[in-house]
Amino acid sequence: MEICLIGGGNHTNNELREVFLELSKMIKPEAKILIIPFATDNSRYESWMASITQAFSIMENVSIELLNEDLSGKEMKKSIMEHDILYFIGGKPERLIHVIEEKGLTPIIKNFQGLIIGYSAGSLAFGHDCIITKDKDYPETIVIKGLGLVMFSVEVHYEDNVDGELFPLSNERKIYAIPNGSAVFSKNGELYKGINDIYSFQYMKKEIVNSKVL
């Protein structure tokens, strides 16, 4: 399983240009992309589809479809199996995890043979532990059970003012902090590539890792 975890950034300007250029090397012409939108409210689906379609327009003849939350679990599983790429969008990671578990999708996602991409909350949900650091939407930092697609945790939209939250959490798990415009790539559970600045937190230590061979 190959996974791309994007920290955040604007799909419609050049902020994610390097990330999508890297993805374009991995995605074959006429690939079928399925958007997993459960982290956000359905009133935002249209704007998400427009921005993601623009971002993928640099790739040749890819098709983009959105997985409707009203489908049954069986219908969702069929749709997932018919696609080459799963793209999990941003919003609230706890909502995303809840719907996936409620619909019984975790096993089929873990066994998916194509490329899985997480953006913001989508990336957060992929970890064994999903860390949600405090901000305007969350008054306190919380840790919930993630989907376990990777054995590390991530911080998205990373800025160094959250280091004080991440250091104590790094005693129990490895955390990769991914700023807007950056991404990490994982294959078979191991990181092998970073795009732009990436930081690791472990045992109360912080390192920049994009300059190293992952």
Residue ranges of model-derived segments:
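C-terminal and late-domain segments of enzyme folds
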Residues: 1-29, 39-50, 54, 132, ...
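A residue-level signal for conserved active-site and pocket-lining positions in enzyme catalytic cores
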Residues: 33, 86, 120, 154, ...
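A structural signal for short, well-ordered beta-strand segments and their strand-loop junctions
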Residues: 35, 117-119, 177-178
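Class I S-adenosyl-L-methionine
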Residues: 42-76
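Flexible gly/pro-rich beta->alpha loop and the following alpha-helix that scaffold active-site loops
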Residues: 65-116
